[in-house]
Each structure stands twice: as structure tokens, then as C-alpha cells.
Amino acid sequence: MNNRVHQGHLARKRFGQNFLNDQFVIDSIVSAINPQKGQAMVEIGPGLAALTEPVGERLDQLTVIELDRDLAARLQTHPFLGPKLTIYQQDAMTFNFGELAAKMGQPLRVFGNLPYNISTPLMFHLFSYTDAIADMHFMLQKEVVNRLVAGPNSKAYGRLSVMAQYYCNVIPVLEVPPSAFTPPPKVDSAVVRLVPHATMPHPVKDVRVLSRITTEAFNQRRKTIRNSLGNLFSAEVLTGMGIDPAMRAENISVAQYCQMANYLAENAPLQES
């Protein structure tokens, strides 16, 4: 028997499809999401409706974004969900969540079992819409969740950690074994809750500058920032901000990265592209 076939659908490797089938895990995720009627609920990658059905049962209307044409067609003819669903058959990586929030008249509550092959770039895409999002609940590769929640001075701490925590409060919810999926992935999974900050704890003047600094620092994470960021900051400037130039990228807090970004935005602003 082909273990990539679930409910008559062949899981597509190119879409990173692994279908959730453990009822206890499904119930735990839905409980964590706690969907309520009247909320603007949006699911990314509903697949075979493992989460769509129990969430949809609690709602009058649910928006889903599904790239796979066959799966989108199955949802359109779903026996009890069909009339409740608004289906966008397109790539979430190019979806305009801001336009959808404006159309629905309220911030979105976004959830999904994200394809692991695009989870990190998709997170960055979603961060650009946090003004339009109330919260997010995602099943991700456990290693990605570890990176999202990691603090300074740890191996998991990186650019994703800094940018996620700049935009959101990041809360791990539960861990999920490979056996909860068909086909079973080769990695452990975990569910995470991300709640965009109502008030930014560390506001930056230009988030593009923060993105540039974190990219350059973590691309050379074994170097001291005196070397990795030497083209942006002198040792004297870093010391003046209370940041030791001998530290490495993983030693610098989110607050310090934001401090550096604001200095650069004031003293060497990026040109509008």
C-alpha cells in the first residue's frame, strides 16, 4: 500500500504535503485556536480538512487558501463545509492578507498545518501583514518552532527568532510526533501561537534596516559583530550603544538589534527603492 495516499489523495512531495490524522492532536489544536462565530478565520493549506472540519463546525464562515487544485475542488464539494467556505486556490506566499482583512472588516485569525518546505519564507510573508492579523496558530517542524521561540546565547537563536519576536509574542503550544501524519514526516512537529504585539516593545523606524542587520549578522554568525557588521557600525558606535563589539550575532538581544537598526535608520537611512 502506498503510504503517501490518504483519503484517496496522493500526497504531493513538491507541495510538502503531510496530512494530520491523529484525533487527539486535532482536538488539541482546535482547542488552542478556540474559533468563535463572527471571527475572520483563515486557514492556510487545509489539505484534506483535518482541521477545517472541526473548526468549520464552530463557524458560519471560513476562508481557506489552498494551492493544490485537486484539494481545492474537494473542498468546494464538501458535504457540510462547502457552503461555509470561501476558497482561494492560490499560493499563500503571494496572498494579500491585508486586502482580505479590509474586505472582512476585522483582523484575521490565521491557522494551518503549514508545508514544511515553505514554512520559514511564509512566516516572513505573514510578518509583513501583522497589522491585519489578530493571531496565528501553525503546525510547523519542531526545529522551526524552536527557532521562533529561541532567546540569545542559544544555537537555535537566529534571524527568524529576532524578526518573529520583533513582530509577535511567540508561544509554543504542543509537540506532535511523526505518527500523527500520513505519510509520516521524517521530523518531529510542534504547534506554535504567534500574537502580533498590540504595542511594539522595541519600535524601529525602518524594519528594512532591522532585516538587513539581522541578515548580515547571522549570515556570518561565527564572526564577532565587529567583523560581520563592520561595514555598518564602528566599534566605537557599538560600544556607545552599550553593545560589546566582541559579541557574536547569537549573543545580541532583540532589543539591541532594534537599537542598532534605529541608529542606522537615523544616520545612514536606506534609499527608497
From Swiss-Prot:
PROSITE patterns: RRNA_A_DIMETH (PS01131), SAM_RNA_A_N6_MT (PS51689). It catalyses: adenosine(1518)/adenosine(1519) in 16S rRNA + 4 S-adenosyl-L-methionine = N(6)-dimethyladenosine(1518)/N(6)-dimethyladenosine(1519) in 16S rRNA + 4 S-adenosyl-L-homocysteine + 4 H(+). Keywords: Cytoplasm, Methyltransferase, RNA-binding, rRNA processing, S-adenosyl-L-methionine, Transferase. One of its GO terms (molecular function) is 16S rRNA (adenine(1518)-N(6)/adenine(1519)-N(6))-dimethyltransferase activity. GO terms for cellular component: cytosol. It is found in: Cytoplasm. It comes from the Bacteria. The keyword Ligase does not apply. S-adenosyl-L-methionine binds at N18, L20, G45, E66, D91, N113. Pfam families: RrnaAD (PF00398). SMART domains: rADc. Signal peptide: none annotated. Its EC number is 2.1.1.182. Belongs to the class I-like SAM-binding methyltransferase superfamily. rRNA adenine N(6)-methyltransferase family. RsmA subfamily. Specifically dimethylates two adjacent adenosines (A1518 and A1519) in the loop of a conserved hairpin near the 3'-end of 16S rRNA in the 30S particle. May play a critical role in biogenesis of 30S subunits. This is Ribosomal RNA small subunit methyltransferase A. It comes from Escherichia coli O81 (strain ED1a). The lineage of its organism: Bacteria, Pseudomonadati, Pseudomonadota, Gammaproteobacteria, Enterobacterales.
